[in-house]
Amino acid sequence: MRSLLCAPLLLLLLSAGESAVITGACDKDLQCGEGMCCAVSLWIRSIRICTPLGSSGEDCHPLSHKVPFDGQRKHHTCPCLPNLVCGQTSPGKHKCLPEFKNVF
């Protein structure tokens, strides 16, 4: 009899558990807004989320495809904003930097 009284309480506790809702989940760049790409999540590698394009001084990956990219990205960073390039700052380290054009 006591177990019958505990069953509804147990169900109430189970249904009140915490859960996560992932916003901005995507598969391809075209599902994200302007100035964003669909990059691999830092926390859950099997999920891609809409991520802002790299700003000046932010980390980048030199092999990131331009936006929009029709396939699935393999990195957690987006390419740099259009007026920036992904330049090497030290061995194995790249950052979004201003694009210097040759004036000659």
From Swiss-Prot:
It comes from the Eukaryota. Keywords: Disulfide bond, G-protein coupled receptor impairing toxin, Secreted, Signal, Toxin. GO terms for cellular component: extracellular region. GO terms for biological process: endothelial cell proliferation. InterPro entries: Prokineticin, Prokineticin_domain. It holds the Pfam family Prokineticin. Residues 1-19 form the signal peptide. It is found in: Secreted. One of its GO terms (molecular function) is toxin activity. Disulfide bonds join C26-C38, C32-C50, C37-C78, C60-C86, C80-C96. Its main location: secreted. The keyword Disulfide bond applies. Potent agonist for both PKR1/PROKR1 and PKR2/PROKR2. Potently contracts gastrointestinal (GI) smooth muscle. PANTHER family: PROKINETICIN (PTHR18821), PROKINETICIN-2 (PTHR18821:SF8). Belongs to the AVIT (prokineticin) family. This is AVIToxin-VAR2.
